Amino acid sequence: MSQHLTRRQLIGGAVAAGGLASWAVRAAALDEPATLFREVMLVDGTGAPGRLANVLVTGDRITRIMPASAKASGSPAQVIAGEGRVLAPGFIDMHSHGDPLHDSYETFLAMGVTTITLGQDGEGPRIGNDLDPKSWMQAVDRARVDINVALLAGHVTLRRAAGVADSVHHLDPAGLERMAAQLDSEMRMGAFGISYGLEYVPGIYSETPELSNLGKVVARYGGVCMSHMRSENDDEIEASINELVTSSLPARPHISHFKSVFGKGEKRARELLAFVADFRRRGIDLTADEYPYEAGYTGIAILFPKWALPPTDYAAILAQRRQELRDYLIARMTRRGGPEALLIGTAPYAGKTLAQAAQQEGMHYADLLIKLGPDGASGAHFTMDKVLQDTLLVDPNVSFSTDGGPGMRHPRATGTYAKLVEEYVVRDRKLAIEEMIRKATGLPAQTLRLPDRGVVRAGAKADLVLFDPKKVRARSTYVDPFAMAEGFDLVMVNGQPAFEGGKRVGFSGKLLRAR
């Protein structure tokens, strides 16, 4: 084990007596590394009350769990003194971005994340000009990556691989068949489902028959349909959820980054949760994920009218409808809190609000948006109500996500899980530690159908995190979005230390495949 553990935490040659010792002897015979977590507060990911325990890891799996009172006996296992710290399954991020072939996920490991879910919002990581993920998946299999990866098939990628132009609304039967065949291939390769980005080009142009055709393919493999829905505006969200459910069935529908833009208060949140619960009462396994921040992060294309989005000739729009576009943008930004409510995250205005950037350029903010164009910037949009979002966040059927990636200028990419522990568990007591961990581990594992992750039990994969909840800190802010979380002492991925002593120490991640 790493040099960063203290002598008290490293007590070589001691494991529990009896059956635990026999596991260690077997591990030595197989020349597999064995590690004993001794006297930890085991929070196992099921929601069960935490309990003091000893946990033995052999190779990449958890091999034995015993009472902390078990007596020690000599063995080759290395021992980590838990000292009552929480030992939990590694966190499973339900909505992630980036590419482990090119990006470091150290900041994710720093907040206890051991598995990310890529292919979100209809688009995946860099998968080559042929738009086929097979070569990318093979490259991840060969590479040394620092985190586990679950991959979704991207709706945008499927469309383009099938030769469907971005602007097409109605697909002909041949186009539908090509998309379905490509999706079937990706599901057979191990994709966990499909993702949609229906508020973005080209998903914004897709219609229900196209989505339903894909849902049937996903259902054959027991996969999930995750969606950045058609609209997250408060007056349109129920219609968007309806579309997600009806177009996914018989596959399982899942709401990505559950939110209500412009919605206010606990009452409205309860209405939305009741709306979702009604589907579940009817036997539809509708789930959702959410991050604990009131600002989203996306491109400024979301501010523009559909008629000004690609593949429309933007120059022609400016020549013919500039004033109409300007009026639309002013109305849109006014409803979304004004130019102070958009914090730009990309050059050359990174770290400035739209109001500040416009002042710097000496122009009205609407004119700056027009100058930038739909694809000209991304940023944090402060459009959500904390009371409403927190009410959604603590619901038992809502798991957690970052919707973040390496280098993103939003604190959710570096602070989500630390914030959940620091604020929602320790400070505000909105969640018990057992429930917070279940929603970060067991629940997402159930949604993705990961039978051997998200739980601490004999036979499960050894993705583990060791920490004292009272010492966890989410250090990132909107001003300093890259500060790593603190307080997660050891993060283990597939039985090997991945993060320890405040830095990444291993590359034991794997590309996971649906079964």
Task: List each model region and its residues.
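N-terminal secretory signal peptides and thylakoid transit peptides that target proteins
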Residues: 2-17
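Histidine-rich, glycine-flanked metal-binding segment
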Residues: 14, 30-35, 42-90
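Acidic, glycine-enriched loop/beta-strand segments at the rims
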Residues: 42-54, 379-384, 388-389, 428, ...
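Divalent-metal coordination cores built from histidine and acidic residues
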Residues: 85-87, 94, 102-196, 215-216, ...
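Histidine-centered catalytic micro-motifs
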Residues: 91-100, 198, 225-231
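Active-site neighborhoods of metal-dependent hydrolases
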Residues: 152-153, 157, 161-173, 179-200, ...
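C-terminal cap of metal-dependent C-N hydrolases
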Residues: 320, 391-397, 402-403, 416, ...
